[in-house]
């Protein structure tokens, strides 16, 4: 029974991962409307209205997925950008001293937030794929002032468990 449950879970995750590229391909910057974006991606987890009337829609795929999408709808109601936030360039922008809000702006909602009381730190983790065959974790450690202390990249333990490592 547990094997069947694992197979069904894996199939569902693969199906979800396979849907996003098709959704992205159906949308075009400067052409697609907010309604079309919501038809493809559903309701966003967060909506931020900017001073000029533009909207920023966040679609995190964490904790089970490997992407976080941020879609901007311009004041004209058309999609002006669609970005996947979890990539090396954004990870490189995270440096000591950044505040939690700045990190969330760069990477979107984390997969996991883990307090480490004895160290007086909090760790945020994001799952990502550096290539199609690997899953890794990008971790950001915050001090008691909610500022970045350091970052780290490690292998995804969930992937290792599935592989029987």
Q: Could you say what each language-model-derived stretch is?
A:
Residues 1-17:
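Sec-dependent bacterial lipoprotein signal peptides
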Residues 19-165:
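Residues within mature, well-folded domains
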